């Protein structure tokens, strides 16, 4: 029998975690992994807008890691379950990519306004969704067990997406627009 997308079990506003526990769809855990899923969709949009195969490969790996985070958040914390691992080396890979991109970028002297090209804007949207996901996971961690590495990865990922947006703008020949406070 083929797997069906629709189950009808969520028609009354609840959804199930891996492990069977049912939660209302407004629960912070559901919001957190739903936002990670939203981030993953935006990263697909960014990846699809790039011609650089190496960066596309990095983004695909990041999307895989976001599924790992989603699986972890979608699992019942009260049950001992085997979920895919997120590793320190995953965070180190983001840091290495940022360091590499930074060697090609001018020093940052001011805040910059998002935009300049649709693909750069998509990357900034992904960055802000990542920050929202991070805030939701932090809020969840204040009430329930959450692996600390998930928070570190999301924090580092938003930094990576900021640097990537700058590198994309540079590669596209788009001038960064600095923000200056009105006086």
PLM regions: where:
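Phosphate/pyrophosphate-binding loop motifs in nucleotide- or prenyl diphosphate-using proteins
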Residues: 1-183
């Amino acid at each position: 029998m083929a797997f069906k997308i629709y189950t009808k079990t969520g028609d009354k506003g609840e959804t199930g975690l891996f492990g069977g526990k049912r939660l209302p769809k407004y629960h912070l855990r559901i919001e957190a992994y739903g936002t990670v899923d939203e981030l993953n969709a935006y990263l697909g949009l960014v990846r699809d807008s790039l011609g650089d195969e190496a960066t596309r490969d990095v983004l695909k790996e990041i999307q895989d890691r976001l599924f790992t985070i989603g699986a972890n958040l979608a699992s019942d914390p009260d049950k001992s379950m085997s979920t895919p691992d997120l590793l320190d080396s995953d965070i180190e890979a983001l840091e290495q990519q940022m360091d590499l991109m930074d060697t090609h970028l001018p020093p940052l002297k001011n805040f910059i306004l998002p935009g300049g090209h649709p693909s750069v804007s998509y990357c900034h949207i992904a960055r802000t969704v990542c920050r929202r996901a991070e805030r939701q996971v932090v809020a969840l961690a204040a009430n329930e067990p959450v692996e600390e590495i998930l928070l570190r990865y999301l924090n580092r990922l938003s930094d990576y997406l900021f640097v990537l947006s700058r590198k994309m703008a540079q590669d596209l020949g788009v001038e960064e627009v600095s923000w200056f406070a009105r006086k």
